[in-house]
Amino acid sequence: IGMGYVAEKHLKAIKQTGGNLIASLDLRDGVGILDSYFPNCSHFTEFERFDRFCSGKDIDYTVVCSPNYLHSSHCFFGLRIGSDVICEKPLVLHERNLDNLIVMQNLTHHRIWNILQLRLGDTVEQIRQTIQTTNSDNVFLEYVVSRGSWYDYSWKGNEEKSGGPLFNIGIHLFDLLLHLFGRKWEIRRWRGDHRYQDGTLFIGGFDVGISLDISSDIAPIRRLSIGNEDFDLSKGFTNLHAKSYEKILTSNGFGIESVRPAIALCESLRNY
């Protein structure tokens, strides 16, 4: 469900792990990217026809790549038709909605799996070792990506639909930080707007400075600094959707509770 930018990563992962995509849904009818992966996939632009096609079929997984504010309802759909669900980040925009999804999981006996691909990066173990041996308690995460004026007019620029940069850009970074440094956090200071977020968190005994910027015209920066050591988050983090699918196919993926800490943190920062 959803054939935007991130969908191709899922198409590639489905192909690499031996899967077959039988149906897709997007408001656009120009989805030529399917030709490179699943040319026989039935494409729909209307949810009702997509629903009718999927109902009663033996579908193993529903993949959710729609705009953030629709993730929860599309996860409900996937569970309702009797499939597991693979959902892009963020699973929800409000922590309370996680509990509703858990209830639906229990009723249907199917699972929701989350794409938390940064946890699977080749560099993660090296970062973890640095955390354990460093004499410094200072950490800085800088993430800069350029987004043109189109961003403000798309659903991504609408905070009600995307959750703002905290959920749309920052969620996978916050998840990685909590995965590495610990799930308990405290907000020391925070400020931001629809294109810039900046502040300091206290996580696992470390003062973690964070700067998220999607308004800059400079080259992208994806850097995590621990003391004097820098880690480029652009390297060692490739083909991770396929790795995520491999874990999901063996029931070793990341479930609903895995995303709760980062969802709670982003929601708290948004309301700070």
Task: Report residues per predicted region.
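C-terminal helix-rich "cap/oligomerization" subdomain common to oxidoreductases
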Residues: 19, 36, 49-52, 61-64, ...
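Rossmann-like dinucleotide-binding domain that binds NAD(P)(H)
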Residues: 152-216, 257-264
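A contiguous active-site-proximal alpha/beta segment in oxidoreductase catalytic domains
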Residues: 92-149
